[in-house]
Amino acid sequence: MGKPEIGTTVVVDVPATTANLGPGFDCLGAALDLNNQFQLKVLEGGAERFELIIESKEGSHLRGGPDNLVYRAAQRVWREVGMQPIALEARVQLAVPPARGMGSSATAIVAGLMGANALAGEALGKEKLLELAIDIEGHPDNVVPSLLGGLCLTAQAASRRWRVVRCEWHENVQAVVAIPSIRLSTADARRAMPKQIVVPDAVSNLGSLTLLLQGLRSGNGDLITDGMHDRLHEPYRWPLIQGGSAVRKAAMDAGAWGCVISGAGPSLLALCPPDKGRAVAEAMEKSWEQEGVQTRALPLKLQSGGSRWRPKPS
């Protein structure tokens, strides 16, 4: 397969995601209308050259080089299609901050896969890109909705094939995400969890997930409230989030049906009626700032289109 011309640029828009939504640990996630944009430009040079330009203070600690997640994902595509690796520059408009539980690493993986596939003439289909994304990330709950959009339930069948179900999200369900200035790595959040679970906790989560999905489908707030309870990961992660319990209470007092940890945290996700969205966001911001934590809380819509790429005119 031929190498694209030097200077060829593709632009990839990748949405933020919120994962788990309480009981859907490592299988349920939703894309939200907050995007990272990646401009991937072909450079002169060999496979070890990857330059990274972040247009945000949030990502000032991120570095280029061959070990960068965007480039590692791109190389997976090129290996699959038998194409020689390309030197790249990535210019990133970063709206989804890293280490906040909003799927920032998933945006990097998906951007690398989609951008590299575009430069390879879209040689791989979406199902293969999904498989690669899950393999790189290690779990599907962020990368799948980031790639496909919407609310996605993903499970590995007995055949080892990944199965994705696009679930309904009623228009009367508003998501509010509070993003604090503090960080929490996914690795630290996973280390806090027990190595084994007990049967009653597993049964409880199965029931909660069923109620939650039905509540999201129908817009029934009572079902959402009952369905957002988790016993597998949240009890062990709340203590890691400074002021998190107070923020959750503030969201509920302002009219939220439920408030859970977004992904591994520390961002929090509240679900509420649309007319309560602004009040819930303001309550969450105020509560966290009373704890000394700068916070940005946003009412966000479900992003149903997933990631998109386009060529940038030269």
From Swiss-Prot:
Example GO BP: threonine biosynthetic process
Superkingdom of source: Bacteria
Record-linked InterPro entries: GHMP_kinase_C_dom, GHMP_kinase_C_sf, GHMP_kinase_N_dom, GHMP_knse_ATP-bd_CS, Homoserine_kinase, Ribosomal_Su5_D2-typ_SF, Ribsml_uS5_D2-typ_fold_subgr
SUPFAM superfamilies, per database record: GHMP Kinase, C-terminal domain (SSF55060), Ribosomal protein S5 domain 2-like (SSF54211)
Any one Gene Ontology cellular component term annotated for this protein: cytoplasm
Subcellular localization: Cytoplasm
UniProt pathway annotation: Amino-acid biosynthesis; L-threonine biosynthesis; L-threonine from L-aspartate: step 4/5
Keyword Cytoplasm: yes
Signal peptide: none
Annotated keywords: Amino-acid biosynthesis, ATP-binding, Cytoplasm, Kinase, Nucleotide-binding, Threonine biosynthesis, Transferase
Record-listed ATP binding positions: 97-107
PANTHER family, alphabetized: HOMOSERINE KINASE, HOMOSERINE/4-DIPHOSPHOCYTIDYL-2-C-METHYL-D-ERYTHRITOL KINASE
NCBIfam families the UniProt entry points to: PRK01212.1-4 (NF002288), thrB (TIGR00191)
Name the record gives this protein: Homoserine kinase
Organism in which the protein naturally occurs: Synechococcus sp. (strain RCC307)
Gene (UniProt): thrB
